[in-house]
């Protein structure tokens, strides 16, 4: 299973999310900011999805998402923010926006849904 890349400049937030997802048996890789995340992608490391913070120094969530979309149009990307108005900055970028704090079970279920989408069955 490809890993989930968590991008957050706050190590406490990043490690907390990693522990939640690892307990649910997801492989997780951390990046301490957008430049580190892009470097991992450009090296060819395979990821099944990205969970990123909105507000980060050097490069914020919207710029990171634009760069990730240039590399992959189908990669599931979840953006977390404490600012409800931030969602408008991602219009047309095909992301999943969630407000912080996100409940651990919601994070697990969202990850499961995005990594293992349900298939249509013909009755």
Put a short name on every predicted segment.
Residues 53:
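Active-site residues of response regulator receiver
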Residues 56:
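Receiver (REC) domain active-site loop signature in two-component systems and cognate sites
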Residues 80-81:
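Hydrophobic/aromatic residues positioned on beta-strands within the core alpha/beta folds
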